[in-house]
């Protein structure tokens, strides 16, 4: 009568075919990995690999800049009805333009204003200023914030509009030098190719951002991280001045993610692949339980050799 001993057959199969057992374990691990990865794609938003840079990564580049507000710089008085130069175009005008991309690239720089955190840290000794400062401006090149290619040589004009006038008299006269933190309106003026082409952050309006009655603008010198840690670094780079730092907090809405339809398709493919691998492993497992040790090995085993059995009987 035909009988199956599953446990014994499985032991014989494992002992007789170790490479195949290792293969089954590897396929099982791969199936579990695909299943886990598919579930991850289903529940998690994934940053799109097709978009190299979005506004989050672009604004984070400015975190590496040091801005020196020096006492030697002259203040420039501004009137409250100051408008953007005619040679620049706001981002709204650029987006509403019906010109082709080639014409837009040649139309000149555009302005984009975003709210950002700005800290001003007076150094000791600090010279101070004769007026309350409401605006800081600087000019950098693209390579200073890590841009490459043609954009590395593009000029980027930066203007910070403070919500209130910055008064440094307590530091200059009484030595009470405390760090000032502002949520400033940062206006970037540059060629359109410098900016990412993804969803933009909320805009601020520089002309109505400050509540000061008199506006004074001061030039700041920018220093990137490479210059800061270079061997020829000048320790007196911002002597008697204040160091300005920009901080951008990550905004998840600015990150370009893989669309839901694409994520569902990826999840479906991974599920199908993992199911196929599981079926293959289960099939091999069932074969091992039923078949046991291969017939060739069973015949070559001395216990089943008919010649030896006949000699033993003799």
UniProtKB/Swiss-Prot annotation:
It comes from the Eukaryota. One of its GO terms (cellular component) is membrane. It holds the Pfam family TMEM219. It is found in: Membrane. Keywords: Membrane, Transmembrane, Transmembrane helix. The chain crosses the membrane at residues 21-41, 179-199, 236-258, 270-290. Residues 80-105 have a biased composition (Polar residues). Residues 78-106 are annotated as: Disordered. It is a multi-pass membrane protein. Belongs to the TMEM248 family. This is Transmembrane protein 248.
